[in-house]
Amino acid sequence: MQAEGRTALTVRTWRTLFSVAWFVWILDLATKIWAVSTLSERSNVKVLGSFFQLTLIRNPGAAFSFATGATIFLTLFSIIVLLTIFYFSPRITSKGWAVVLGLVTGGILGNLIDRIFREPGVLRGHVIDWMQLPNWPIFNIADSAIVIAALISMVLSARNIPPITKVGS
């Protein structure tokens, strides 16, 4: 009986993880296509005054200008994180953690695709960022998904909900 329950949980959590990841990735891709076709480089379109603006940039690094020009490192790191998520995903203990890992997976895929395929070239691509808040780096949907995942993971951890089962459980 426990094996059947575990199988059902695994199927549900995998479905949740991959559905969330797919949704984030598609939304990120669609909004980046829209931003590139609609916004001009470095122009500010005020949506909510100076609080929320649309500003298109092509980011060669990560948030806060970290690792600018280290696209290959960021690409490899992203691939390692994705492989780690896939390795541990069969042992996810709850739908909440499946959502967290789905958000992270979708966010990583969104920025990884940019790094691999966008200009200036393969494995040197710049990430499309286009949303701006005051005193914060310009970001995109993928970045937002990763931040939301971090916040949800803090709540789950505070509630003592473990992310994965131990080997042999």
Label each residue range with its predicted role.
Residues 1-169:
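Alpha-helical transmembrane bundles and membrane-interface segments of multipass inner-membrane proteins
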